[in-house]
Each structure stands twice: as structure tokens, then as C-alpha cells.
């Protein structure tokens, strides 16, 4: 069975964590977008929500379905340089950080 992928060719950089942002990114990926999830080395905190299997919760697996991922330390110059390069090449940038 084939289905339409209206967002095919759209590149998304996803720095969101938790529930809403990763879910949005998963929907974009399901509609064909190339979503790159950027996480800290310890992973998104949603990895511990609910029942876990290895390093992932069921929500973490579902919320990151169809995404590629990279772990970066945004407190380092190198980590910021890499994420800035990804953002420069992206069509969409998602984040869910608190203000400030």
C-alpha cells in the first residue's frame, strides 16, 4: 500500500524534548519529511516515561519513529557549530526550550 508524502524533500532539525515536540516531528516524518533529532548524550528525558525497554520508553520509540538522530553537547563550541550547520541546511527548525 502506498501513501502520499506531501513533505518529501523537507528537511527538519528537531531539538524538542518531551511529548508535544517529538510527536510533531514524528508526524512530519510520517508525511515524508527528513527529520533529524538532536539530543544530548544522555538522551531526551522522555526515554524514561512509562515502561522502558533498554534505553527507550514506548513513547520514546513511537515519538522518534522515522527520524534520524545525532547526540551533541550544545555547551561546547563544536556541538553548537554542528547544530548551526544542520539548521542552516534545514527548511524547518523545531525546539521546545523555555524562554531565556
Predicted regions mapped to residue ranges:
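N-terminal helix-loop segment corresponding to the beta1-alpha1 unit
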Residues: 1-100
Amino acid at each position: 500500500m502506498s501513501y502520499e508524502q506531501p513533505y518529501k524533500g523537507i528537511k527538519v532539525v528537531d531539538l524538542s524534548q518531551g511529548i508535544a515536540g517529538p510527536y510533531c516531528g514524528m508526524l512530519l516524518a510520517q508525511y515524508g519529511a527528513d527529520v533529524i533529532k538532536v539530543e544530548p548524550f544522555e538522551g531526551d528525558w522522555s526515554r524514561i516515561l512509562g515502561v522502558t525497554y533498554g534505553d527507550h520508553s514506548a513513547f520514546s520509540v513511537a515519538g522518534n519513529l522515522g527520524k534520524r538522530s545525532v547526540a551533541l553537547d550544545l555547551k561546547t563550541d563544536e556541538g553548537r557549530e554542528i547544530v548551526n550547520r544542520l539548521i542552516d541546511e534545514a527548511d524547518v527548525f523545531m525546539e521546545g526550550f523555555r524562554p531565556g
